[in-house]
Amino acid sequence: MKLLYDLLPVILFFLAYKFYGALPPEWILAVGVWLPVALEPDNPGHAIYLATAVAMVVMAVQLALGLAIKRRLETMPLLTAAVILVLGGATLWLHDPVFILWKPTLVNWLFALVFMAPPLFGRRTLVETLMGHALSVPRAIWSRVNLAWVVFFLVSGLANLFVAYTFSEAVWVDFKLFGMLGMTFVFVIGQAVYLGLHHREDDPHTTKGDPS
């Protein structure tokens, strides 16, 4: 359920884009009143603007709910929201989809920085911090997995740019949901297998429960 909640902005972006032409014209015109771009129901090129606005609203609502319920905002969702709101706003104000096309790339590269930062300052890797309570593996393995995440995020960002600038906008919208979700799923499965191979119960040389 949490995965679906986290993916909600991406899913609704996809649906708003794909079904733009099927929406009642009066709905589109009503939404356009609130946007800096005047939406034209018979203009397929405006689908990206409606989709962007939908994603921005959903992300803002999620942030507000998270703050109201948990009284705090987690780093990753906050970074994602900041990028969506800034680039989405630029897309709408400047009437240029190129900004929202860069959103997955910037989010992935920011995540890469987040995963890189702790070891650079002599701290535990983020992967170990998040999963060390559940798995006992050597610290060297945590470092490799953390590095793998950094590489994955960098490659994902490059893949997004390749698709965005090589194929049509419609293909990019498909890739944004299915391609990136598929890449992430395969990577997570591979990580789980790798960690499972190195997991050792009650091994004194592992890091489970190590507070350092």
Swiss-Prot record:
Name it. Inner membrane-spanning protein YciB
Superkingdom of the source? Bacteria
Membrane topology type: Multi-pass membrane protein
By its UniProt entry, which NCBIfam families does this protein fall under? PRK00259.1-3
What family is this protein classified in?
Belongs to the YciB family.
Question: Where is it mainly found?
Answer: membrane
Q: Where in the cell is it found?
A: Cell inner membrane
Organism per entry: Thioalkalivibrio sulfidiphilus (strain HL-EbGR7)
